[in-house]
């Protein structure tokens, strides 16, 4: 079993065309290499649609809302700027019924993902996926999402 992150697997791979780096297509193109290594199962870290930008729960008001100058001796206090964080890994709730669009080299992420799974199966390999479901999430939604990926994309 080989666990991989779709974007991280090929983002720096110069043998892939630049447009395909970090995409489902790049993994599809690397299947012969993975098969040669003896890998029989690919485990994808979250590849469903999720929010990549972490939105801070506590926001800092912009200067024009919180600071007024009443004289020349006033020194403007330093404002704390929130650091933008990127959720690279995807272990957050998301849209469990869609492949991650930014992991596709084309406008049709669903077809590209379907092609990846189909090509893996043609080469005698399995494709399993990881999902993050928040504690307390409705179990019917979880089961519906898992069934969807099996029926729609034939993941194992």
Model-derived features with residue positions:
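Hydrophobic faces of well-ordered beta-strands that scaffold small-molecule active sites
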Residues: 2, 42-44, 127-129
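Aromatic- and acidic-residue-enriched carbohydrate-binding clefts of CAZyme catalytic domains
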Residues: 16-23, 54-122, 135-155
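Short, solvent-exposed turn/loop segments enriched in Gly/Ser/Thr/Pro and often Arg
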Residues: 45-52, 131-136
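Flexible loop residues that form catalytic
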Residues: 9, 47-49, 101
């Amino acid at each position: 079993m080989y666990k991989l992150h779709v974007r991280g697997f090929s983002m720096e791979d110069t043998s892939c065309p630049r447009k395909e780096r970090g995409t489902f297509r790049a993994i599809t193109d690397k299947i012969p290499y993975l098969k040669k290594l003896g890998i029989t199962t690919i485990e994808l870290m979250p590849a469903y649609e999720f929010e990549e930008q972490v939105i801070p729960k506590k926001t800092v008001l912009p200067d024009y809302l919180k600071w007024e100058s009443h004289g020349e001796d006033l020194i403007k206090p330093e404002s704390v700027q929130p650091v933008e964080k990127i959720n690279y890994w995807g272990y957050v709730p998301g849209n469990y019924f869609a492949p991650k669009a930014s992991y596709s080299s084309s406008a049709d992420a669903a077809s590209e993902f379907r092609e990846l799974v189909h090509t893996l199966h043609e080469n005698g390999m399995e494709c399993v996926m990881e999902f993050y479901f928040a504690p307390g999430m409705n179990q019917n939604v979880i089961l519906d999402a898992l069934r969807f990926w099996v029926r729609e994309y034939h993941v194992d």
